[in-house]
Amino acid sequence: MKSDKITLRNMVFYGYHGVFEGEKELGQRFEVDVELHMDLSVPGQTDDLEQGINYVDVYTIVQTIVQERTYDLVEAVAENIAETILDAYSVDYVVV
């Protein structure tokens, strides 16, 4: 199976995640990188966005999870990002 990679790097958001109360009250800056692994031959050949991944939608998924939800662990943030992308797109795997 052919696998290509799309990487969105250095997405910066302000969120309220952490185990300590101060982290949740004050918030902090989070920088997120996401790798999407899949076969991109069809969108590459057809030049059709509907056959591929809309980067704006992926960015919005990450933004929503980081900015609008609260988690104790950064691992939970990453897991939720990965699961949401896997549910939304036909990708082989996601690295956050």
Task: State what each model feature region is.
Residues 1-96:
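N-terminal, polar/charged subdomain of small-to-medium soluble alpha/beta proteins
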